[in-house]
Each structure stands twice: as structure tokens, then as C-alpha cells.
């Protein structure tokens, strides 16, 4: 009898998670990269990155599974079996319990001008609801073991988000702010045709605050944006590729950065240029990164992107130039 009850319970559980709609989408890109470094031989690499996304929905419930299929093949290892890497990335479930939206699983954190989303945390959970036009979200994860509360909404044409982070474990992130509570504020609006954003981090940790702003406007078909981030001596900016591109990878604790970006369309091509200057806490570590990109949609449904990057590092002889051709 107990076995029959157990079988019935399992069958009921399996039925309850069946999905009415299942979709499978994906993307693929291939990159050829030539890197010419001062004092070293130039290198040529071909890499590919594929993603498959499986989504199942049943009413207001959704399950999302993302699988990455990457391969980093150089000219010398093109036939190496170790060059390919297939792994599960984001896996999460979202649903609603009354007026409360629930999401749980594994995913990347949200990009900000201070931090990219490279860190994927597990055991994530988010509970959110709207109260009088303000979205209130409470979230946490198994990696950091700290609860975060976010208030967001629009106030007189200004989008605002205020984040209160509880004390995380001191070894959870490797940053000075680990083990310390932080408050974050993000504002965005349009002033006389200029898109303006402002962000700040106020940490209980010593000399670990940061502030940043971006201003952008279109002039005669050319969008010009300026971004600036100022970090205290113990805070490290890990970057937002939209603002600082690859230059964020050169930033260390206490470094500041400024970026100017221009973007326009020419004969069906999207053309952009970005000039980033990293003002390092140690002057000998200053870096300038200039990037030029041309993107064009092709008739076959793919997109061709050509990027040239020139990196000039102060006090070193490892300046380099990189040409990257991407088909996606």
C-alpha cells in the first residue's frame, strides 16, 4: 500500500511540472583574432561560442535552461578534444504566488557601471511585488549568503533604484566590501535631450565607496556619450562593457576611468569608436584603450563585426593591437 501511495505521489508530482509550451532557441558566433604585442610574436586564434536555450511555460510558470557550447581552438590545437567545453549555465524557475513574483535557480547578476555580470551564483531566490507603483524585491543566494532589498520605480520622470545589501561573508567576493553592508543608488533621466545616469555605492568598509555618471546625446545622427567612474582607494571596478569595454580588465583596486564613445550609421553599417583612459591609483599602471568597431548585417541572416583595439599601457613594453572579426 505504501509503495502504491509513493508511486501515485511521484506521478502527481511529474504531472504538476509538465509544460504546455516548450521552445528551443540558440545562437552561434565564430571569431578570428589577430593579436600583435610589442616584443612578442603575433598570435592568430579562431574561437566559437554557441548557446542553446530551452524554455518551458505552463500558465504563469516558466523554466529556463541555458547551455553553452564553447570551443577555443588555436592553429596548433584545432583538432584537440580538450578545445570544446559544454556546460550548463543559467537554470531558473519563475512563477507567481498571489501578487508575489518568485524566481529561483542559478543565473548571472545584473550588470552595473561598477560590476559586470561575470559571476554566476547558485541557490538564487527573488521575491518581488509592486506597492503603490514601487517594486519591492528581496533576494539572496547560496554563494554570498547575504540578503539584498531593492526598491525601484519612477519619480517625476526619473527612474530610481535603491539597493540595501546586508553583510555578506568576508570571503564571498574577494573584495574589500565583502563582509560589509552596502547601499547603492541608481538614477536615470533625460534633461534637455541629454540622457543622464548616476550611480553610487556607499559601503561600511573603509575607503570602499564609488560614484559614476554617464551623459549621452545624439548630434546630427551621431550619438556621443561620456562615462566617468571614481573609486575609493579600496574599491575595484570590474566594469561595464557598454561603458569601458575591455579596459575594465586592466583596472585594479582604487583605479578610476573615463570613456568617450561615438556611434553612428554609415551606408547600412553601424560604426562606433570608444576611447577609454584608466587613471590608476599607481601612475605607472595607467592604460589607454581605443576601440573601433564596424557592424554589418549580411544577406544570409548573419552579422559581420570587425573590431580593432589599440592598448597602450604606461611603464610597460607589452602594448598590443588586436584585430577581431566576428561572424554571428
Please give the residue ranges for each predicted region.
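A beta-strand-loop signature enriched in Asp, Gly, Thr, and Trp
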Residues: 201-267, 272-280
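Short amphipathic alpha-helix initiation/capping segments at coil-to-helix junctions
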Residues: 255, 284-287
Amino acid at each position: 500500500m505504501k509503495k502504491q501511495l509513493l508511486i501515485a505521489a511521484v506521478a502527481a508530482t511529474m504531472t504538476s511540472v509538465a509544460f504546455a509550451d516548450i521552445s528551443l532557441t540558440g545562437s552561434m558566433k565564430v571569431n578570428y583574432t589577430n593579436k600583435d604585442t610589442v616584443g612578442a610574436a603575433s598570435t592568430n586564434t579562431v574561437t566559437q561560442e554557441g548557446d542553446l536555450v530551452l524554455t518551458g511555460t505552463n500558465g504563469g510558470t516558466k523554466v529556463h535552461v541555458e547551455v553553452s557550447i564553447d570551443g577555443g581552438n588555436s592553429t596548433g590545437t584545432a583538432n584537440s578534444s580538450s578545445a570544446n567545453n559544454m556546460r550548463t549555465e543559467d537554470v531558473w524557475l519563475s512563477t507567481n504566488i498571489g501578487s508575489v513574483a518568485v524566481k529561483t535557480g542559478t543565473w548571472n547578476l545584473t550588470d552595473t557601471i561598477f560590476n559586470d555580470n561575470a559571476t554566476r551564483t547558485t541557490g538564487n531566490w527573488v521575491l518581488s511585488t509592486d506597492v503603490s507603483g514601487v517594486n519591492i524585491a528581496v533576494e539572496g543566494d547560496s554563494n554570498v549568503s547575504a540578503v539584498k532589498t531593492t526598491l525601484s520605480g519612477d519619480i517625476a520622470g526619473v527612474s530610481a533604484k535603491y539597493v540595501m545589501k546586508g553583510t555578506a561573508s568576508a570571503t564571498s567576493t574577494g573584495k574589500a566590501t565583502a563582509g560589509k553592508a552596502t547601499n547603492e543608488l541608481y538614477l536615470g533621466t533625460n534633461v534637455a535631450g541629454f540622457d543622464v545616469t548616476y550611480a553610487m555605492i556607499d559601503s561600511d568598509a573603509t575607503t570602499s565607496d564609488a560614484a559614476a555618471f554617464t551623459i549621452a546625446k545624439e548630434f546630427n545622427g551621431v550619438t556621443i556619450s561620456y562615462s566617468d567612474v571614481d573609486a575609493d582607494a579600496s574599491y575595484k571596478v570590474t566594469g561595464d562593457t557598454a561603458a569601458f569595454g575591455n579596459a575594465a580588465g586592466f583596472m585594479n583596486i582604487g583605479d578610476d576611468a573615463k570613456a568617450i564613445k561615438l556611434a553612428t550609421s554609415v551606408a547600412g553599417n553601424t560604426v562606433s569608436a570608444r576611447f577609454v583612459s584608466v587613471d590608476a591609483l599607481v601612475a605607472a599602471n595607467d592604460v589607454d584603450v581605443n576601440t573601433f568597431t564596424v557592424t554589418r548585417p549580411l544577406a544570409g541572416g548573419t552579422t559581420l563585426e570587425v573590431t580593432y583595439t589599440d592598448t597602450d599601457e604606461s611603464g610597460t613594453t607589452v602594448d598590443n593591437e588586436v584585430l577581431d572579426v566576428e561572424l554571428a
